[in-house]
A protein has these predicted regions:
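Catalytic Walker B motif of ABC-type/P-loop ATPase nucleotide-binding domains
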Residues: 46-49
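H-loop/switch region of ABC-family ATPase nucleotide-binding domains
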Residues: 81-82
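A short, surface-exposed alpha-helical micro-motif characterized by mixed small hydrophobic
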Residues: 87-89
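C-terminal boundary and immediately downstream tail of ABC-type ATPase nucleotide-binding domains
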Residues: 109-140
Length: 140
């Protein structure tokens, strides 16, 4: 188990931090450490609820890169996010909720290209896309 944890810490860029206290880590490092703790449990599905909401922009990238790696490794995830470019790049499905009810459930290209509901159209308009990002264009 310890070998696996050390390998995962290395994979998310936290080598040498295995003995650090939470107060010694940045927000992004804390999020990545939490992801490593979850991965050590070998879950069938990982749930992320606004995992980047309280982070500074430079920390957001760190966390999204880890989630991108998980997506590339075909990890099953349910991600609640307002990071629309990222969602478009990594999602197999997009589900738009309003007051706890599903308003749209479709693939990313259809959701971003031809939203069905007025709610989705207004939601996407609020992001003012200037171009269509390519898969993984958001995270370098």
């Amino acid at each position: 188990m310890e070998e696996e944890a050390l390998a995962l810490l290395k994979r998310v860029g936290l080598s040498g931090k295995e003995n650090a206290y939470p107060r010694q880590l940045s927000g992004g490092q804390k999020q990545r450490a939490a992801i490593v703790r979850a991965l050590c449990m070998h879950p069938e599905i990982m749930l992320f609820d606004e995992v980047t909401a309280a982070l500074d922009p430079e920390m957001v990238r760190e966390v999204l890169e880890v989630i991108l790696q998980l997506a590339e490794n075909k990890r099953t995830m349910l991600i609640v996010t307002h990071e629309m470019q990222f969602a478009r790049a990594v999602a197999d499905r997009i589900i738009l909720l309003d007051d706890g009810r599903i308003q749209e459930d479709t693939d990313p290209e259809e959701f971003f290209g031809s939203p069905k509901t007025e709610l989705a159209k207004r939601f996407l308009k609020s992001f003012e896309y200037t171009r269509s990002p390519k898969p993984y264009d958001y995270v370098i």
